[in-house]
Amino acid sequence: MLIIQLISGFTQSEKAWNGVQELREKLLSELDDYSSLSVRIRLDEWSANWRAIARQMYMLRERYPQEPLTVLVFAYSWGVGNGLVRLARQLNRFGIDIETAVISDGVYRHWFSLGNWRVILGDRRIVLPANVLSVQGFHQETSYPMGRQPLLANGKQCDPWTKIRLEHVEMDGSRDWHRRCIRVTKDAATRLVGGITSVPAAAPASAALDSRISNGSEP
């Protein structure tokens, strides 16, 4: 089972369309052939209840014990500095890794709101927990705040670390970031899911599921 977690930035919400929502639509289009039982996409705001979300992923793993669980995270701005960091910490409680994170101009978020002025000075860097196994990143040096290369607790480097000529508020819509997220997703789906007719063992029975398995496509 492949879970793709998207995390939006600190000025973004459901009230206005943004680049992370557009990325979700692109991924849904690219993955349309796959069963939504096997490939699942989530989009949450940076300040979401990451403890509950991590527990939901753990419960999915328990619900389908024969299915290896793989998590990818695509995050922007505070979606990196808060969302990705907190999700990884909570997933670690359940022994779940994030196989790959692809980040766009990730910004450090201090636990105390007045501490966030240090972000402007550029003296704080995001530290990603060791269960974030690999990171690919994009950043800009055109406007403040600027994303800095995160530190990985597992000792690895963010690779590649690519500079883009956009302002911070435009980085969620970066075509380069979107293309990389799509490529990472498609590679993982091909490698891990097995095929468009693949569904988790012990999935609830239905006529639609039988049709997918027998015909190799949606009814």
Identify the residue ranges that each predicted region occupies.
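Short, conserved catalytic or adaptor-binding loops enriched in Gly and charged residues
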Residues: 28-33, 127-129, 154-155
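Generic hydrophobic alpha-helical segments
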Residues: 53-61, 84-88, 181, 185-192
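Serine-dependent carboxylesterase/thioesterase catalytic core
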Residues: 2, 57-151
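Active-site catalytic motif of lipid deacylating hydrolases and related acyltransferases
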Residues: 1-69
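Sec/Tat-exported extracytoplasmic proteins
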Residues: 31, 60-61, 91, 105, ...
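C-terminal catalytic-base region of ester-bond hydrolases, centering on the histidine
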Residues: 130-219
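Extracytoplasmic/periplasmic, Sec-exported soluble proteins
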Residues: 12-19, 45, 76-79, 127, ...
